[in-house]
């Protein structure tokens, strides 16, 4: 009888855990641009063995529809080098904004200023204008931000001497912005910045950690960029909400009564 109860408890616990665990999934758009020639976001996620919904072909055809399970929309570095993707992202601005408003996170790392100087799919009140300036100098403004904390503790040294061909750590620094909180800067201009929107958030960067992880000039660049990709996913996707942890603890507390 006790064994039967134990089996029942384990089965119920598994069911309840699945119901309170975050059903977060990644949606991506990615492109092998003319400079790096690699679809680095895909390759990085495949290396990490992380499943994702690839909407690139749909976006090329002009549509962007998110699944209910999607929690993070990650646009690969230099994706807008593909003019069809650039134009379609702009045309689907409402879809992107609604995704964030409902609680989704949107991340866009480095884009070439000649392809996407102004990020036109951002909502009213938020602006991001990219430039052609690259820089090896930078400063972390918010060292306690979660993106530098887990699973890898990272500081300014972690980002030093990144490179791809002749480009340094900061690639296409953000020239101007409105409505964002700056997390890292270079030449007193934003490098990483984020803004809350509805229940979600927009994260813009002048870093290309996906490209640098796959196509960096040296092992240090590839390693550190990979560690930062892990941190991005942890900070903006995998972190378990406090309320979910509370529910799980409550469930376990009730089930212990069977023993």
Outline where the language-model segments fall.
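Flexible, charged surface loops at secondary-structure boundaries
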Residues: 65-69, 100-101, 174-178, 196-198
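A glycine-rich, often tryptophan-bearing local segment used as a flexible ligand/cofactor-contacting loop or short
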Residues: 79-166, 170-176, 221-230
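Bacterial N-terminal signal peptides that target proteins for export
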Residues: 1-9
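Short secondary-structure junctions
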Residues: 52-54, 127-131, 178-184
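A short acidic, often aromatic-flanked loop/helix-cap motif at beta-alpha or helix-coil junctions
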Residues: 59-65, 136-139, 146, 191
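Extracellular ligand-binding/catalytic regions of CAZymes and related secreted enzymes
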Residues: 22-30, 35-36, 117, 179-181, ...
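Bacterial N-terminal signal peptides
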Residues: 8-18
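Helical hinge/lid and interdomain linker segments adjacent to catalytic or ligand-binding clefts
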Residues: 25-120
């Amino acid at each position: 009888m006790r064994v039967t109860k134990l089996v029942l408890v384990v089965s119920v616990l598994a069911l309840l855990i699945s119901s309170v665990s975050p059903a977060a999934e990644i949606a991506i758009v990615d492109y092998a641009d003319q400079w790096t020639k690699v679809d680095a976001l895909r390759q990085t996620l495949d290396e990490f063995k992380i499943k994702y919904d690839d909407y690139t072909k749909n976006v090329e055809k002009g549509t962007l529809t998110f699944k209910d399970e999607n929690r993070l929309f990650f646009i690969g570095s230099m994706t807008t080098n593909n003019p069809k993707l650039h134009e379609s992202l702009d045309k689907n601005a409402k879809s992107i904004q609604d995704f964030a408003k409902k609680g989704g996170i949107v991340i866009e790392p480095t884009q070439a200023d000649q392809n996407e100087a102004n990020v036109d799919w951002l909502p009213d009140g938020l602006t991001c204008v990219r430039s052609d300036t690259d820089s090896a100098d930078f400063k972390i403004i918010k060292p306690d931000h979660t993106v530098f904390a887990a699973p890898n503790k990272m500081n300014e040294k972690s980002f030093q001497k990144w490179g791809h061909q002749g480009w340094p750590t900061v690639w296409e620094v953000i020239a101007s912005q409105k409505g964002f909180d700056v997390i890292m800067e270079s030449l007193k201009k934003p490098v990483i910045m984020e803004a809350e929107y509805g229940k979600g958030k927009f994260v813009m960067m002048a870093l290309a950690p996906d490209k640098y992880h796959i196509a960096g000039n040296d092992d240090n660049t590839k390693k550190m960029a990979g560690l930062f990709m892990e941190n991005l996913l942890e900070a903006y996707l995998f972190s378990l909400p406090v309320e979910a942890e509370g529910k799980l603890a409550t469930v376990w507390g009730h089930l212990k009564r069977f023993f």
